[in-house]
């Protein structure tokens, strides 16, 4: 039997809310009118949706329409309920309406428009200060959703929209997000491979908000070391091997022992033995301008096997790495 675990913060948030806050299965969707929106151009497609830039013809305002592919009603309700609960939260994409296509009966979510520089293109070009600035903005969104009893479960560059001109960040795609209830066992088939925490890879289901902090750590590592992605596994098994090559196998086994987790036998042949590496060994001439002792200390406190050892979003914001941001000593516009 694996041993239980609970979040260090915001543990009982949902227990103190009315059931209708988190009971999305009984949620009744308030469908708006699709005729108010005209699609302008396709922005992209995901596993579960197609995304378009659109215009609200009654207000002439730009917006973004996410047309959902056929998926369980329950999953759609969960995404809508979470977006409604988080509406108005710091740096959380704003859901404006939910409509149904009259012909296909396909649901579509209408969002505020964000100038679409996705982080991925941008974040290999950012300065040290800008990396700190945007990660701080992302942490505001994570602390907000965690404080509201919600785990995002798919934090990655692709789901972070940045309007670089206006220094505006939005955390998007809440399709995998879920309500946190201590003691609940969750599906480990969430997040994108390169950003999956060790708990998912070893099939530990009683995870919590700290999963998002691992994913944030992976983003930080890829940004400061200019290595995208930082842990580049070819499949979910290889993903854990890539992590173990950096964090060490002894440390992995200590984590498994602590929670009494049985490793899938497939790992025995591929894991081998790896010593823990110092973060300094990833520093080279092309990335040294982005690396500082406080950046490495911050990274070290995020990329921990044991989810309870990772910084929370609130603790992360208090880390010295963000002092230049908190003090606002510099203006990002005049940073080289």
Swiss-Prot record:
Annotated residues for binding of ATP: 43-51, 66
Subcellular location: Nucleus, Nucleolus
A GO MF label: protein serine kinase activity
Pfam families per record: Pkinase
EC number: 2.7.11.1
Catalytic activity: L-seryl-[protein] + ATP = O-phospho-L-seryl-[protein] + ADP + H(+); L-threonyl-[protein] + ATP = O-phospho-L-threonyl-[protein] + ADP + H(+)
Family: Belongs to the protein kinase superfamily. Ser/Thr protein kinase family. CK2 subfamily.
Quaternary structure, from the entry: Tetramer of two alpha and two beta chains.
Protein name as catalogued: Casein kinase II subunit alpha
Organism: Drosophila melanogaster (Fruit fly)
């Amino acid at each position: 039997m694996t041993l239980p675990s609970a979040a260090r913060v915001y543990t009982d948030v949902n227990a103190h809310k009315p059931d209708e806050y988190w009971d999305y299965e009984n949620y009744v969707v308030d469908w708006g009118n699709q005729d108010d929106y005209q699609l302008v151009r396709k922005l992209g497609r995901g596993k579960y949706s197609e995304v378009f830039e659109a215009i609200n013809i009654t207000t002439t305002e730009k917006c973004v329409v996410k047309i959902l592919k056929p998926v369980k009603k329950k999953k759609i309700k969960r995404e809508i309920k979470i977006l409604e609960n988080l509406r108005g939260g710091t740096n959380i994409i704003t859901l404006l309406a939910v409509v149904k296509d009259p012909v296909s009966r396909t649901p579509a979510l209408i969002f505020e428009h964000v100038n679409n520089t996705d982080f991925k293109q941008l974040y290999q070009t950012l300065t040290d200060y800008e990396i700190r600035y945007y990660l701080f903005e992302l942490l505001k969104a994570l602390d907000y959703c965690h404080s509201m009893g919600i785990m995002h479960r798919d934090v990655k560059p692709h789901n972070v929209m940045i309007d670089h001109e206006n220094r505006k960040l939005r955390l998007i795609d809440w399709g995998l997000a879920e309500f946190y209830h201590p003691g609940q066992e969750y599906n480990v088939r969430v997040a994108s491979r390169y950003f999956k925490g060790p708990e998912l890879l070893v099939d530990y289901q009683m995870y919590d908000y700290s999963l998002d902090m691992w994913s944030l750590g992976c983003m930080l590592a890829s940004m400061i070391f200019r290595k995208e992605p930082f842990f580049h596994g070819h499949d979910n098994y290889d993903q854990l091997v890539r992590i173990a090559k950096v964090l060490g196998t002894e440390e992995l086994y200590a984590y498994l022992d602590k929670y009494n987790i049985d490793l899938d036998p497939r790992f025995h042949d591929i894991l081998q033995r790896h010593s823990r590496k110092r973060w300094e060994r990833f520093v080279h001439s092309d990335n040294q301008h982005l690396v500082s002792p406080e950046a490495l200390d911050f990274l070290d406190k995020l990329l921990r096997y044991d989810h309870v050892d990772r910084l929370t979003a609130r603790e992360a914001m208090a880390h010295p790495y963000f002092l230049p941001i908190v003090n606002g000593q510099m203006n990002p516009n005049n940073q080289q």
